[in-house]
């Protein structure tokens, strides 16, 4: 855990609020300096998965593609790449199977929280690496398609709105 932020001022700061629920998309984050960070943070790299340990029902699991510091309310999980594909593990941590497992431990009323041993206690189905890699490639393609479709939907809505304004406005 890092407590002295000298040299880290320009690093992205990923708070739990910067991780979109269900998708893990990183949104609205700022730098360590911009946020005026004073409490301890964890260093993460593109090799890590960021798993939110508070309010596990929100299913906040991010796969960053940059280096930064994350909230102490998250676990930066470093994947052993010789036995597990990072994208495969990330999607498993977002799965209903894992969510059902982890919610059974979430026993605090005001701010549900899970501990590291509970996360590590999950028995992950681990197919051969080539199958995990195929899965990760497929998921990346699906994500690219989703982005392209969303862009088309946004453009179509914009066109529709402008036509409505032109004809009925």
Briefly describe each language-model feature range.
Residues 16, 63-64, 79, 124-126:
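Hydrophobic residues in beta-strands and at strand termini
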Residues 37-38, 108, 147:
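Short, solvent-exposed loop/turn positions at domain surfaces
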Residues 1-2, 98, 161:
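Generic structural signal for secondary-structure transition and capping sites
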Residues 1-4, 11-46, 65:
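Sequence-specific dsDNA recognition surfaces
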Residues 121-169:
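Amphipathic alpha-helical coiled-coil/heptad-repeat segments
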Residues 54, 68-75, 107-133:
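A short glycine-rich beta-alpha junction/loop motif
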């Amino acid at each position: 855990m890092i407590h002295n932020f000298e040299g880290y001022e320009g690093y992205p700061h990923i708070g739990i609020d910067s991780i979109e629920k269900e998708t893990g998309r990183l949104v609205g984050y700022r730098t360590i300096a911009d946020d005026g960070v004073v409490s301890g943070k964890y260093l993460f790299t593109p090799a890590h998965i960021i798993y939110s340990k508070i309010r596990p029902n929100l299913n906040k699991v991010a796969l960053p593609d940059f280096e930064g510091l994350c909230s102490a309310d998250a676990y930066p999980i470093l994947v052993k790449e010789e036995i597990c594909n990072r994208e495969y593990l990330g999607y498993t941590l977002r799965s209903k199977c894992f969510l059902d497992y982890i919610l059974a431990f979430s026993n605090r009323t005001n701010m549900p929280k899970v501990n590291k041993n509970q996360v590590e206690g999950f028995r992950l189905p681990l197919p051969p690496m080539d199958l995990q890699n195929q899965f990760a490639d497929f998921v990346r393609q699906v994500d690219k398609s989703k982005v392209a479709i969303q862009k088309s939907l946004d453009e179509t809505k914009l066109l529709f709105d402008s036509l409505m304004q032109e004809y009925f406005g």
